[in-house]
Amino acid sequence: MEERSMQKAGFLKEPIKHIGITKHNVVPMVEEMADMAFQARNLARAASIVDLMQKDKECAVILTLAGSLISAGLKQVIIDMLEHNMVDAIVSTGANIVDQDFFEALGFKHWKGSQFADDSELRELAIDRIYDTYIDEDELRVCDDTMAIIANSMQPGAYSSREFIVEMGKYIEEKGLDKNSIVYKAYEKGVPIFCPAFSDCSAGFGLVHHQWNNPDNHVSIDSVKDFRELTKIKIENDKTGIFMIGGGVPKNFTQDIVVAAEVLGYEDVSMHTYAVQITVADERDGALSGSTLKEASSWGKVDTVYEQMVFAEATVAMPLIAGYAYHKRNWEGRPERNFNAMLDAKPVNA
């Protein structure tokens, strides 16, 4: 066992560090990229649109997250955006929020690795690999168990993923864990986080353990409630902008709230006014992740005046786009919407 621990420690030596957006003013460089070609020009236009979302004080900004972003070093970018009131709601894969951000709040790290590693050796040492990044599987199991502990502490019933993630924020606070966390910062700021496929991560392992041991009286996640709550945000704040990192469920879920509002009788609801997506997916296979925002306009989801696709890898493009919008400082004076408070408010009986 001691030899195994030493072998494992040999792989887990250099932690991934998170880049922020407040130190380096990238505005001059991004503005010069506007006179280049290809994805440089697309990125510059995307940055200007994300800045417009900040400048337009009526616009609620929804950030969507797909792909392995937090493990790759983008956590601080998102925390900086939350801290400076640049984001009003987040829709994410469960892995980014639970397996990666909350995992780090528990005190664990992601580690620099190699895409050329011997995966059979990693498996023997309980090291999980995400391309060139390592995660300690034994520590991930602690994260799984913590999700079960949180579920066990809650009143049985059906919750939206947002409501469960609020409890995760409370847990960080109560246990004195690392507050430099997306989950905690969103909890502190009243910014809702939705994970429509919440069971597809450590939350799923924790919840299945919780339900297995409490078969008749347990916590469950209601994904339709997620959809209803996010749609309510659109109904209450008609003008919206979406900044999409990757595609997948978070992208489609967020685009669909326009149609959902129409289904609920709000036929004059606006399409998303602003839309930017960073992706490496290809539109030609018909899959959602690479489908263009112009295509989304045919479904009545996204307006085409202020939309931009950037075909680039997120760890390169997101800090530049978010950093540009931060240093333009048009987020100053944006109202704090605190959608969590709005969604938690009990209806007044007539």
Swiss-Prot record:
One of its GO terms (molecular function) is deoxyhypusine synthase activity. GO terms for cellular component: cytoplasm. It comes from the Bacteria. It is an enzyme of class 2 (transferase). The keyword Transferase applies. Pfam families: DS. Its EC number is 2.5.-.-. InterPro entries: Deoxyhypusine_synthase (IPR002773), Deoxyhypusine_synthase-like (IPR023496), Deoxyhypusine_synthase_sf (IPR036982), DHS-like_NAD/FAD-binding_dom (IPR029035). The keyword Transferase applies. Keywords: Transferase. Belongs to the deoxyhypusine synthase family. This is Deoxyhypusine synthase-like protein. It comes from Chlorobaculum parvum (strain DSM 263 / NCIMB 8327).
